[in-house]
Amino acid sequence: MTEDQAPILDFWGPLRKTTQSRIGLGRAGDSLPTKRVLEFKAAHAAARDAVHEPLDSETLASRVDGVGIGAPVVVASSVSTRSEYLRRPDLGRQPADLSAIKSSDKEIGFILADGLSPRALMDHGEQLLSALVTALGERYSIAPPVIATNARVALGDHIAAAMGVQTAIVLIGERPGLSVADSVGIYLTHLPRVGRTDADRNCISNVHPPEGLGYEQAARVVLGLVTGARQLGRSGVDLKDTSRADAVASGEVLTLD
């Protein structure tokens, strides 16, 4: 085999298997290879579809009911259409009608919100909720869950106040990107009330196994944050997640072959 016939090694191939990020795209003249251009267009289309796809609240409610913490109530924000939801974030933070929610004296309240990716909630909502209930259920009382459509994170404050819970945990579809269109974010607010800001919350993002954070891993982080928030008396910027340091100390770290 001559030097000109030597095989071309794909340096990026092994690295590409470890991430969904768009790395090592290559070149074809002054542009990208056709394969990479088509991959980009497909990812963009998937992100657009995830944003505009409506939540199948009936199917999700049936799945959530099977978790065993009570039949979920379905509520909506003040948004009338999906396009209005994208144009008016403020309306997504305001409830339309919360009269169906019954107040309780429970400690934890789960709100499953479609957010910017209803697909994420359909793909991961039930399994993530089940993992959270398993992690928290032995220590804390849990109210029947609420499903919210056309919802922003702050809508959870209104819902949690109506639920009468001490800690609100919002599971919401995150804004799709060009590598992930089905990621769930978890927002924890201790002593929720209308008017809370993002500084009063803790967020665990990128929940979408197998590529992203796993359900059980996320549940362990949430358990630590809930315990810390109750000890501290508040959530937000003063409450730190130490689970990563604990994982390193215990030897539970990611290694690449």
UniProtKB/Swiss-Prot annotation:
Substrates-to-products reaction catalysed: ethanolamine = acetaldehyde + NH4(+)
UniProt cross-references to InterPro entries, sorted A to Z: EutC (IPR009246), EutC_C (IPR042251), EutC_N (IPR042255)
EC numbers, comma separated: 4.3.1.7
Residues that bind adenosylcob(III)alamin: V153, E174, C203
Needed cofactors: adenosylcob(III)alamin
GO biological process: amino acid metabolic process; ethanolamine catabolic process
Cofactor binding comment, as recorded: Binds between the large and small subunits.
Annotated pathway: Amine and polyamine degradation; ethanolamine degradation
GO molecular function: cobalamin binding; ethanolamine ammonia-lyase activity
UniProt entry tagged with the keyword NAD: no
Gene Ontology CC: ethanolamine ammonia-lyase complex; ethanolamine degradation polyhedral organelle
Keywords, ordered alphabetically: Bacterial microcompartment, Cobalamin, Cobalt, Lyase
Subcellular localization: Bacterial microcompartment
Subcellular location, principal: other
Cited Gene3D superfamilies: Ethanolamine ammonia-lyase light chain (EutC), Ethanolamine ammonia-lyase light chain (EutC), N-terminal domain
Complexes and interactors: The basic unit is a heterodimer which dimerizes to form tetramers. The heterotetramers trimerize; 6 large subunits form a core ring with 6 small subunits projecting outwards.
Protein purpose: Catalyzes the deamination of various vicinal amino-alcohols to oxo compounds. Allows this organism to utilize ethanolamine as the sole source of nitrogen and carbon in the presence of external vitamin B12.
Family: Belongs to the EutC family.
Protein name according to UniProt: Ethanolamine ammonia-lyase small subunit
Organism annotation: Rhodococcus erythropolis
Gene transcribed to yield this protein: eutC
